[in-house]
């Protein structure tokens, strides 16, 4: 089986699982498709990977799609991947991954991808979704945001921190809702 077929199989089986969340029978389910680490401009068949995801999400008639980072660059050569992503007719969301900031500041990436902020929340059905940004590293004294691949000079044990500002925002955001909450992030939350 060639690499492209393996990528498509991987997408179909693991990355493209449409997630249905419903805890009480009376509630309408919220259906969304989630993907991460497309690395679209850097892998063979990057455009086809995104197209496969969008087609599957459209076929499943999901309420929204979200990618959890390491998607594509903001340069004109990567516009094709953003166009495929934006071809989805429904609601679309992004989280920022570490490699999304290899060439950009967080502000450049947020604006370039049309995100409301580097972390944000939204409600869908009876659920509250929180998109977090774990793209921070510690230099041993302070927490700094990733910016133009600056995270590479520190060991992995110093990566993936949530900054104080974001944690304070998260505390207020969670206190403001009674809905069941789903946290989404490129990095693991430990």
Feature names for model-found ranges:
Residues 1-7:
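Positively charged n-region of N-terminal signal peptides that target proteins for export
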Residues 8-18:
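Bacterial N-terminal signal peptides
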Residues 34-36, 64-70, 92-98, 182-186:
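Active-site neighborhood of phospho(di)ester-bond hydrolases with catalytic His/Asp-centered motifs
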Residues 174-190:
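Short acidic, glycine-rich surface-loop motifs adjacent to enzyme active sites
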């Amino acid at each position: 089986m060639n690499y492209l077929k393996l990528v498509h199989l991987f997408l179909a089986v693991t990355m493209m699982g449409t997630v249905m969340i419903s805890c009480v029978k009376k509630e309408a389910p919220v259906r969304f498709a989630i993907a991460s680490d497309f690395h679209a401009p850097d892998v063979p068949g990057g455009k086809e990977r995104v197209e496969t995801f969008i087609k599957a999400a459209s076929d499943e008639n999901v309420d929204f799609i979200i990618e959890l980072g390491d998607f594509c660059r903001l340069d004109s050569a990567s516009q094709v991947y953003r166009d495929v992503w934006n071809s989805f007719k429904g609601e679309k969301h992004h989280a920022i991954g570490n490699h999304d900031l290899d060439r950009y500041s967080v502000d450049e990436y947020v604006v370039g991808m049309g995100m409301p902020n580097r972390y944000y929340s939204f409600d869908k059905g009876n659920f509250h979704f929180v998109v977090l940004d774990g793209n921070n590293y510690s230099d041993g004294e302070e927490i700094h945001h990733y910016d133009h691949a600056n995270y590479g000079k520190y060991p992995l044990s110093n990566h993936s921190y949530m900054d104080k500002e974001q944690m304070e925002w998260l505390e207020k955001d969670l206190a403001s809702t009674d809905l069941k909450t789903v946290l989404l992030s490129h990095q693991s939350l430990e």
